[in-house]
Amino acid sequence: MAKIFIATPMYGGQCFGYFAQSLMTLQNMLRDNRVDMACSFLFNESLIQRARNALVHGFLKTDFTHMMFIDADIHFNPADVLPMLLADKPVICGIYPKKEINWNQIHAAARAGVPPEDLRKYSGSFVVNLIDYQNEQRVELDKPVEIWNGGTGFMMIKREVFEQLKEHVPSYINDTNDLGGNIGNERIHEFFATSIEPLGERLLSEDYHFCKIWRDKCQGSVWAAPWAQLSHIGTHKFDGILTEKPQPPQSQEV
C-alpha cells in the first residue's frame, strides 16, 4: 500500500493559507482512498539544499513508499496528487509558474480579444524542458510527459530513487540544531546540491542537480504531470499613477 510523506521546508516557520488549505483537503482525500499520509516541516533552515537533504534523511527513517516535496508557497489542487501516485513514475512533478508576471503574453491575449476577467490565465511564465523537443510537440494533458528536469516545489519521488542514488552521492555530518530533536550528529546524504553543468557551464539549482544525477548516475527518468494546476505565491509591488488613464490608439489617415 502506498504511503506518502509530505515534506515542506518552511523558512521562518511560515506558510501561506492557500498551501495549508490544500494540504488539509489532501489529507482527507488520501484517507478516503486509503492512502496513508504524514507531514514533515523543517523550520528556519536558510540553506534550501540542506533543508531538502534533512527532509529526505527523515523520510528514509520511515517505511513510507513515496516522498512528496510541496513547498509552503504552492497552492495546489489536492485532486491532482492521486493521479501522480497512480502514474507510477520514479520522479514526477507539477509545473508551476515563476514569480513574475508575463506582461507580453497578457498584452498579446488582450489584443486577441480575451475578456479582462480571463487575462490572469495568461500571466504565468513557465519553464518546461521536454525530452526530444523538436519545434512544436503535442502533449496529452492527462498523461505524464518526460522532461529533463523539474522543480522540487511540487515533486513526488519514490523511495527506491534515494536508495539507488545513495552510493553515488557524498555525505556529511549534520552540525545544525534541529528544533524537533530528530537529527543529531548524523550522516546525511547530499542528494540536493548546486553544481556547474559541464557542457553549458550553467549553475544548476538543487532541484535540477538532483534530476541530473538521477539521470546520469542511475539512468533514471523524470516526468511532469501536465494536469496539475498550481499557483506560486509571492509578494508584488503594486504601482499606479492616479492621473494616468490609458488612451485608445489614434487612427492614422492615409
Where are these regions (language model features)?
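Conserved donor sugar-nucleotide recognition element shared by glycan-biosynthetic enzymes
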Residues: 48-52, 124, 207
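Cationic, hydrophobic amphipathic alpha-helical membrane-interacting segments
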Residues: 12, 33, 38, 100, ...
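Short beta-strand-to-loop acidic/aromatic patch adjacent to the donor-nucleotide binding site
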Residues: 64-75
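Active-site nucleotide-sugar/metal-binding loop of Leloir-type enzymes
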Residues: 53-66
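Conserved catalytic core of nucleotide-sugar-dependent glycosyltransferases
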Residues: 56, 77-193
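C-terminal catalytic/acceptor-binding lobe
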Residues: 2-5, 167-254
